[in-house]
Amino acid sequence: MTIQMHKKVKITVLRTEYYQELAEQYAISYLGKCPFHQKGQVLYSDGINPPDGMCGVAWQVIAPMARQLSLGEPVQPSGTWLNDDRVGVFACPDGIRPVIFLLEAE
């Protein structure tokens, strides 16, 4: 039986967006940018557990990719759309105030 060691996964917030026109049409009046994450914020995961302070909805989206990276596997077939197999760029599913994350295997 082979035991596979997990790499640490660094999760960096690249951008936080807020689409005012969509918020005005579809959201409550006091909605603003994501309250969980700020540009430049860095979090770490073992690829299995969400880091402290991570938005649960965003984690549900990026967890499969974090797991792959923690196991040393690429998140996409080599050269498909990213130029480095050890990284991934993903967004949370909030269409009004999405957050863009960079995941890196360490």
Annotate each PLM feature.
Residues E24-N49:
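Short, flexible N-terminal segments of the mature chain
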Residues A63-E106:
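Short, compact, well-ordered microdomains
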Residues T2-K8, F36-K39:
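A short, structured loop/turn motif at beta-sheet edges
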Residues G40, P51-S70:
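Short, conserved turn/kink motifs that form compact alpha/beta structural patches or helix kinks used as
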Residues E17, G47-G53:
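Short, charged beta-turn/beta-strand-edge "cap" motif at the junction between a beta-strand
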Residues Y18-A23:
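Short N-terminal binding/cap micro-motifs at the start of the first secondary-structure element
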Residues K8-R15:
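A short beta-strand micro-motif
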